[in-house]
Amino acid sequence: MLEKDVVFLRPDPDVTLTVPSSAKIPIGVGGMDQKSGILYLDSGRGNTIASVVKPDFVAPAVGVQAIGRLGNYVTLTGTSAASAIAAGACAQIMEWGNSRGRRLLLNSVQIGNILIRGCERNPDVSYPNTAWGYGKMNVYDALMKFYGV
């Protein structure tokens, strides 16, 4: 059925990053099921070729409620939903950094580092790792740690 020169590679679930999360600078967002607390199985995993930890962290990716283009509620699943949530968190941190006279002009690397500092981590898991990155994104904790509270 197959040609004799066809071979199958040994699959490795820890080498499944795709562009743009495989690049150095962009924030790589993995996915998790926020109800069960487990990793979203279709979430890409693994460090970059330059051994940069990716994903940076995980965000909700299963059963995410959103507003559809017709104004109706829709349910989304996938790391695109997780990335949208993380993008909203980045915008929130940018706004926070520039409000109330702070005038902090934060770049994407700084915002990513702020979010990483606030990640929730399971004490039984070693971080960073190729599945969870630095943990579960927690914007409130990130801002509290950044602000020194």
Question: Can you describe what each PLM-predicted range is?
Answer:
Residues 62-127:
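Hydrolase catalytic cores
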